[in-house]
Amino acid sequence: MKIAANGRFFTIGLVASWYSSNIGVLLLNKYLLSNYGFKYPIFLTMCHMTACSLLSYVAIAWMKMVPMQTIRSRVQFLKIAALSLVFCVSVVFGNISLRFLPVSFNQAIGATTPFFTAVFAYLITFKREAWLTYFTLVPVVTGVVIASGSEPSFHLFGFIMCIAATAARALKSVLQGILLSSEGEKLNSMNLLLYMAPIAVVFLLPATLIMEKNVVGITIALARDDFRIVWYLLFNSALAYFVNLTNFLVTKHTSALTLQVLGNAKGAVAVVVSILIFRNPVSVTGMLGYSLTVCGVILYSEAKKRSK
């Protein structure tokens, strides 16, 4: 009985850590890029990936949290590099969108990921779902259309970036299912991050130097005036790794259904917390639109489960 209770507390603690790190990194990204005025989303993403590279190595090679899996061929490496590029695009575009959009609206758009996943799965693998599954995507898209039309802080460029980030995130999940589908090439999410993060840094470094000129010099100058920026960047980057770590652990210690429910609720919690902190204006119509999208996502998950 005591072991079961301890296990329950451990799972609750894991879920709380997962929520805190997810919502924390989102809010801190928004604060840095928008409120603090640190307008360098590519450099910020590079900091995240550098932390993920270092901390992944510590967790796997030193702490042995999971067994280390090796890359077995050049083809497998190229597949991981392709995934890493799409992953980079999704994170960078997501961070760019946070400069222009409130977190609440950003999350509403992000909730349309199942729509893009279904589209890419059909276009790339010709995988067709049951008609009922496609029908449940109607409220997902309709909700975002309603939320967009009534969003007081709507910004077209931010909106396009957020849609692109959501589409890239969906594309990565579809490609991952195709590229790493054979038993010999399958990697757990911790090992995949161990290899993807350094490759992402290689992609992001030239992009940062070309598109965000002298960002290192600007950051050093900022640190001289306000050293808090260094702590913000270090904490934010470590938090970005803990999002992945807690996501892996929650997946391992809960069922797929529990994870789905928690994932849907997480977006709603992030919306409420961000509105309370940033006090961005929201409309009743916008919140109804977001609620419709979340309901659509829940129906979509249920329809997919039943069609299996």
Curated annotation (Swiss-Prot):
It comes from Arabidopsis thaliana (Mouse-ear cress). Belongs to the TPT transporter family. TPT (TC 2.A.7.9) subfamily. It is a multi-pass membrane protein. The chain crosses the membrane at residues 9-29, 42-62, 77-97, 100-120, 130-150, 154-174, 192-212, 229-249, 258-278, 281-301. Residues 29-147 form the EamA domain. The keyword Nucleotidyltransferase does not apply. Its main location: membrane. Keywords: Membrane, Sugar transport, Transmembrane, Transmembrane helix, Transport. It is found in: Membrane. GO terms for cellular component: endoplasmic reticulum; Golgi apparatus; membrane. InterPro entries: Sugar_P_trans_dom (IPR004853), TPT_transporter (IPR050186). The keyword RNA-binding does not apply. This is Probable sugar phosphate/phosphate translocator At3g11320.
